[in-house]
């Protein structure tokens, strides 16, 4: 074996050769574009290349190729280490959340699996079950972070998959097996594929549910807090101002959930195979039969900690990550988990994504330093007031689908506020634009996994390859939701929002405050 062959085999491991060559071409091309043609073009190429690594997540985890591209971008001067650090520190709460909250949810898996297994066994209608997942995710995301909600549902779905896979492989419920190996399930491949399709649809319904609920409240998404702070809105006023857009969108989103399940389109409609239902029902009975007082106490303790988790997040008693750390401490202490190796397993899911998110912040720093969104922002602000709402909504949605939601919302709300202080727009127009920015950032961005952090977390989780959920599959399955949420949101911003805002103001429900 030659040195070149050995190097090429080592580079990005078992990834396809065409993929390795693509990354090498990107690494050669970017400095040439940056130094000889245009930093602006080089910046946009980097963004497209990073999206490519996300799209190929099942070929190679995006951390390595994306990290190489980001490292090179910093090395050639497209951004600086100081700026990357500033972007990381600005989103440090999100990193804390990933480090501790996802690990905390791991230790509540027993309670979650118990509760959702009962739901899955009791509710036989796929449409009702899909609505249950979508609505519960929307409700939870209105008060909790969407990443936390998705982490909970991933944990549950992983539990379902693991139970069936063990039995289908000829093992018992308590046996330790490799759930990534399907060699022993050859005779049940059709059942397994149908089960995977069933789980994919539940995950997508829940994922979209987090967007439907997260846009409605002050605490639903990180960018909501930024927008509310700039507009001087409290919890109640934020909800009322968003309602003319978010309520019609929620209703239409739920109708979409029912229709796509009923019509068996866009990868939805597959029901839970009867054989899998039987295994899960048997698992539920076995768990109840062997449940002694100690096991019941563990469920009660996890339930109490779950109440603390919801209350702590809803009332912002501490940073999300710190509440997650408290969940780790409380569940492990009172459920008797003291082994370092067992505790270490809880961090396996979140830390690779945490590292990937830091790489993503490097790309965001390049977007800012190279002013990649500058022409779009200038065009929107130069438009007439009558078209500004639509343009703000539309371009926020477009940019949020390829970049960080928090970054896009921050840039646009700051530009809108600068225009207000410069006398370019009125206070009333600024308040309408704030709603357009918030809804535009949150709703159309369900189109792609990199549009929503929760979707990106799902795509790069260990569950995604198990249920065959790729980037392309997520985009395809999200398409009906993307169309409905975007169009209904756009129509609501244009035709319902201005009149409803005036009506709420006349009732005294909202007040225009100087900002």
Curated annotation (Swiss-Prot):
Q: Which family does it belong to?
A: Belongs to the NhaB Na(+)/H(+) (TC 2.A.34) antiporter family.
Q: Transmembrane segments in this chain: where? A: 23-43, 44-64, 88-108, 119-139, 143-163, 202-222, 238-258, 303-323, 324-344, 357-377, 389-409, 447-467, 477-497
Fetch the NCBIfam families from UniProt: NhaB, PRK09547.1
Q: Which UniProt keywords apply?
A: Antiport, Cell inner membrane, Cell membrane, Ion transport, Membrane, Sodium, Sodium transport, Transmembrane, Transmembrane helix, Transport
Q: Which reaction does it catalyse?
A: 2 Na(+)(in) + 3 H(+)(out) = 2 Na(+)(out) + 3 H(+)(in)
What this chain does, per the entry, is described as: Na(+)/H(+) antiporter that extrudes sodium in exchange for external protons.
The way this protein sits in the membrane is described as: Multi-pass membrane protein
- UniProt subcellular location: Cell inner membrane
Q: Extract one GO cellular component term from the record.
A: plasma membrane
UniProt cross-references to PANTHER family, sorted A to Z: NA(+)_H(+) ANTIPORTER NHAB, TRANSPORTER ARSB-RELATED
Q: What is this protein called?
A: Na(+)/H(+) antiporter NhaB
Against Pfam families, the record matches this protein to: NhaB
Which InterPro entries does the UniProt entry name for this protein?
Na+/H+_antiporter_NhaB (IPR004671)
Q: Name one GO molecular function term.
A: sodium:proton antiporter activity
Please state the protein's primary subcellular location.
Answer: membrane
Asked if the record carries the keyword Translocase, the reply is no
């Amino acid at each position: 074996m030659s040195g070149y062959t050995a190097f090429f085999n080592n580079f990005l491991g078992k990834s396809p050769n065409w993929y390795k060559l693509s990354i090498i071409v990107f690494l050669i091309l970017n400095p040439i574009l940056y130094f000889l043609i245009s930093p602006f073009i080089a910046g946009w190429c980097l963004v497209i290349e990073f999206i490519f690594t996300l799209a190929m997540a099942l070929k190679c985890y995006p951390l390595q190729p994306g990290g190489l591209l980001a490292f090179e971008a910093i090395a050639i001067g497209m951004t600086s280490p100081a700026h990357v650090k500033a972007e990381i520190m600005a989103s440090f709460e999100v990193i804390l959340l990933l480090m501790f909250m996802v690990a905390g949810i791991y230790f509540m898996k027993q309670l979650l699996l118990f509760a959702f297994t009962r739901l899955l066994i009791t509710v036989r209608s796929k449409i009702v079950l899909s609505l249950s997942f979508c609505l519960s995710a929307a409700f939870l995301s209105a008060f909790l972070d969407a990443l936390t909600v998705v982490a909970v549902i991933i944990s549950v779905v992983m539990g379902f998959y693991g139970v069936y896979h063990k039995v289908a492989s000829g093992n018992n419920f308590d046996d330790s097996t490799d759930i990534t190996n399907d060699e022993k399930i050859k005779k049940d491949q059709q059942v397994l594929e149908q089960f995977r399709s069933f789980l994919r649809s539940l995950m997508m319904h829940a994922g979209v549910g987090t967007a439907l609920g997260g846009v409605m409240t002050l605490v639903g998404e990180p960018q909501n807090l930024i927008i509310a702070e700039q507009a001087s809105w409290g919890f109640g006023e934020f909800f009322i101002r968003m309602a003319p857009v978010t309520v019609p969108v929620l209703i239409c989103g739920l109708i979409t959930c029912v229709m796509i399940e009923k019509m068996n389109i866009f990868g939805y409609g597959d029901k839970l195979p009867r054989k899998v239902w039987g295994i899960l029902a048997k698992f539920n009975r076995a768990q109840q039969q062997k449940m002694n007082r100690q096991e019941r106490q563990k469920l009660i303790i996890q339930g109490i900690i779950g109440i603390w988790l919801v209350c702590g997040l809803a009332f912002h008693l501490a940073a999300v990550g710190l509440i997650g750390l408290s969940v780790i401490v409380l569940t492990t202490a009172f459920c008797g988990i003291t082994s370092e190796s067992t505790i270490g397993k809880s961090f396996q899911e979140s830390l690779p994504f945490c590292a990937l998110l830091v790489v993503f912040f490097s790309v965001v720093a390049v977007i800012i330093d190279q002013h990649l969104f500058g022409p779009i922002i200038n065009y929107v602000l130069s438009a007439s007031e009558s078209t500004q709402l639509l343009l703000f909504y539309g371009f926020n949605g477009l940019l949020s689908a390829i970049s960080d939601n928090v970054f896009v919302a921050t840039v646009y709300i700051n530009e809108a506020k600068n225009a207000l202080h410069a006398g370019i727009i009125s206070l009333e127009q600024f308040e309408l634009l704030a709603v357009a920015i918030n809804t535009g950032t949150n709703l159309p961005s369900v189109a792609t996994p990199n549009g929503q952090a929760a979707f990106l977390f799902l795509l790069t989780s260990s569950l995604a390859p198990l249920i065959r959920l790729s980037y392309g599959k997520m985009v395809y399955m999200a398409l009906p939701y993307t169309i409905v949420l975007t169009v209904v949101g756009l129509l609501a911003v244009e035709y319902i929002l201005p009149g409803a805002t005036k009506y709420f103001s006349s009732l005294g429900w909202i007040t225009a405050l100087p900002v």
